[in-house]
């Protein structure tokens, strides 16, 4: 059925596009075509998530339609509500892998440490994710070749791609979460990492003040979805920004994350406060938010996405940009940010990304294994 839909769509649209471009007319999809494309994309997203999530609601909108490189390029935005299918965190593949690895630990001290970490993660997952609707926004692109002759129809290949946040485009197979086997392996690997490399960074009295769940809720409230006003050049008056803080418009990412951290309990000082460089600068080239948080012993750096629970900072290593993780259920992750504005935005690859995780987990009331 999917193949038949693609062939018919490619044929119909190709004839229309060729005619429109020859006449130098703007090409528009009619209502029925838009409806079919949206329905197709929605089904592909639901199928990609079917192993782990039910999808109570999904809304896909066509953002733009262009002819480029002999293809019809359709950019789409999706808002997805997803709920984990499992009834307990114990049923998640990542947790299963952790518990299996813990059962093999013979040293009592190591066993107790690993077990304590697993119990706290399970508590977090059961309360914040199991049975809870998670909102997610994602960008997609459909590429339909323009076919000049009907004889070439069966050689055509229409692509639906996920537009990742580090400027990658991924196939729907790559967009889909990892297999259960891979997630179990990652759970085992993480327990080994805790046992072999665990250390704590306790250099400040402030880590215990940071409530990462409050920070999570703050960034969700004061960021816009991947919609009308998600870009840096839109009307600032339409953006969802907290009026209690200054708005740096086209360079507001660090200012936004600083707000969340402060609202979540970390006190300001002479160096890190609104208006100072450490507050509104990322630290990509030194002397910024990231530098301050690490030097003060509040956050530590890791490239392990499983450590980056909600309330962690996400940083782009090749750009001066930061955001905050707002969801990590061990299957998928989302983040919120300003400039460009993102709200519970999906991402898959972590190439070019690093995470800064609170050294104190306010939710489980324990120091975070590094």
Question: What are these model-derived regions, one by one?
Answer:
Residues 1-4:
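Positively charged n-region of N-terminal signal peptides that target proteins for export
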Residues 14-28:
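Sec-dependent signal peptide cleavage junction
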Residues 70-82:
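A short hydrophobic beta-strand element
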Residues 80-97, 130:
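Short, cysteine-centered beta-strand-loop-beta hairpins and adjacent loop/turn segments enriched
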Residues 108-214:
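Non-catalytic propeptide/linker segments at domain boundaries
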Residues 192-278:
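N-terminal capping segments
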Residues 276-342:
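...with weaker cross-activation on analogous glycine-rich loops/strands in unrelated enzymes
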Residues 334, 348-370:
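Low-complexity, Gly/Ser/Thr/Pro-rich intrinsically disordered linker/tail segments
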């Amino acid at each position: 059925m999917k193949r038949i839909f693609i062939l018919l769509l490619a044929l119909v649209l190709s004839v229309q596009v060729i005619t429109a471009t020859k006449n130098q007319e703007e090409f528009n999809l009619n209502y029925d075509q838009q409806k079919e494309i949206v329905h197709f994309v929605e089904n592909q997203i639901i199928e990609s998530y079917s192993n782990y999530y039910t999808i109570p609601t999904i809304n896909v909108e066509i953002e733009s339609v262009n002819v480029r490189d002999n293809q019809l390029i359709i950019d789409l935005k999706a808002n997805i509500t997803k709920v984990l299918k499992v009834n307990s965190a114990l049923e998640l593949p990542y947790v299963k892998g952790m518990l299996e690895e813990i059962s093999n630990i013979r040293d009592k001290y190591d066993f107790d440490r690993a077990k304590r970490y697993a119990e706290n993660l399970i508590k977090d997952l059961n309360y914040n994710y199991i049975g809870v609707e998670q909102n997610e926004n994602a960008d997609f692109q459909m590429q339909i070749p323009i076919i000049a002759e009907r004889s070439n129809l069966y050689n055509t290949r229409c692509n639906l791609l996920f537009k990742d946040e580090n400027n990658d485009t991924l196939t729907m197979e790559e967009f889909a979460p990892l297999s259960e086997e891979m997630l179990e392996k990652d759970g085992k690997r993480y327990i080994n990492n805790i046992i072999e490399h665990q250390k704590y960074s306790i250099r400040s009295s402030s880590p215990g003040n940071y409530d990462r769940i409050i920070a999570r809720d703050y960034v969700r409230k004061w960021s816009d979805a991947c919609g009308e006003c998600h870009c840096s050049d839109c009307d600032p008056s339409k953006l969802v920004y907290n009026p209690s803080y200054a708005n740096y418009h086209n360079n507001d990412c660090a200012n936004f994350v600083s707000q969340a951290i402060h609202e979540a309990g970390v006190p300001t000082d002479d160096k890190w406060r609104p208006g100072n460089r450490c507050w509104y600068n990322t630290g990509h080239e030194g002397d910024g938010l990231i530098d301050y948080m690490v030097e003060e012993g509040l956050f530590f750096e890791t490239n392990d996405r499983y450590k980056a629970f909600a309330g962690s900072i996400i940083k782009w290593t090749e750009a001066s940009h930061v955001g905050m993780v707002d969801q990590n259920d061990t299957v998928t992750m989302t983040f919120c940010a300003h400039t460009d504005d993102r709200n519970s935005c999906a991402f898959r690859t972590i190439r070019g990304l690093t995470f800064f995780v609170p050294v104190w987990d306010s939710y489980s009331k324990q120091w975070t294994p590094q």
